[in-house]
Regions:
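Extracellular receptor-binding modules and their adjoining Ser/Thr/Gly/Asp/Asn-rich linkers
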Residues: 1-218
Length: 218
C-alpha cells in the first residue's frame, strides 16, 4: 500500500459502517479505535456467565489448545483444531471425521497434538483485593470456551455497587470480580485502569456497573 498523501490506509467495516482504521499522517501510523485483548481460558475449561468488564487475574497455568494430525487421501499431512473430550490427552490416536478430503467426507485415524503456547496464561475471576495479578477484564466468550481478556486500550470496567468513581480515578481489584477506586494517583502494579467519563454504561443484577476506561494491564 502506498498513498500519495495522508489519510486512511485500511478501513474495518461492519454492515457498511466503519468500526476502525489504520491511517498515516506524516511519519505517524495510527490504529483507531484500539482495544487490545488476549485469548484465555478458565482452569476447568468451563464457560460460565461472566459480566462484561469483570476483573480477571492470571493463574499459574498456561492455556491449552489441541489439533488432530492425519494424512489425507493424497498422503498430505493435515492438522485441524480439536477440543479434547473427557479422558482424552495429547498423543492419543482417535477416529476423526474429515470433511475436506478430495474424495469426500471420510473417517481417518488421527493423532491428538498439543499446540505450543509459551505466553498466554489461564485466568480466574479476581478474588484478591488490590491484586497485582490482574490480567485485564472479561470481554466475551467464543465457541471453543476461549475468552477475550482486554488489557490495553479503551474498554469498560465493572465497578462494585458500593463504589462511586469519577473521571480520572485509577482502579484496582475489589477482590470479587469488580473494581474499586485506588487510593493515591500513582500507577501501581495493582492498577487496572483509569476512568475516562462519569457515565454508567450498564448496570447488572447485583448492582455492579460498568464505566468507560483506559486499560493499563499490559
Amino acid at each position: 500500500m502506498n498513498r500519495a498523501d495522508d489519510g486512511a490506509m485500511l478501513l474495518f467495516q461492519s454492515a457498511g459502517s466503519t468500526e476502525g482504521n489504520i491511517s498515516i499522517s506524516g511519519s505517524t501510523c495510527t490504529y483507531t479505535t484500539f482495544t487490545g485483548a488476549h485469548w484465555s481460558q478458565l482452569s476447568d475449561n468451563s464457560k460460565p456467565t461472566i459480566f462484561k468488564g469483570t476483573v480477571m487475574d492470571s493463574i499459574d497455568e498456561m492455556c491449552d489448545w489441541y489439533v488432530v494430525e492425519f494424512q489425507d487421501s493424497e498422503g498430505k499431512t493435515v492438522r485441524e483444531q480439536y477440543i479434547l473430550k473427557d479422558g482424552e490427552s495429547a498423543g492419543d490416536t482417535i477416529s476423526h471425521v474429515y470433511k475436506g478430503d478430495s474424495t469426500g467426507e471420510k473417517t481417518v485415524s488421527a493423532k491428538i497434538v498439543k499446540e505450543e503456547n509459551s505466553h498466554l496464561p489461564k485466568v480466574k475471576v479476581s478474588d484478591t483485593s488490590a491484586s497485582t495479578s490482574v490480567y485485564g477484564v472479561f470481554q466475551t466468550w467464543d465457541e471453543d470456551n476461549d475468552m477475550n481478556v482486554v488489557g490495553l486500550g479503551t474498554y469498560v470496567v465493572r465497578i462494585h455497587k458500593d463504589q462511586t468513581v469519577a473521571k480520572g480515578d485509577l482502579l484496582e481489584s475489589n477482590g470479587d470480580g469488580t473494581a474499586k477506586k485506588q487510593s493515591g494517583t500513582a500507577m501501581l502494579s495493582s492498577t487496572i485502569a483509569k476512568v475516562t467519563a462519569n457515565v454508567k454504561i450498564e448496570t447488572y443484577s447485583d448492582g455492579s456497573y460498568t464505566v468507560p476506561c483506559t486499560l493499563h494491564c499490559g
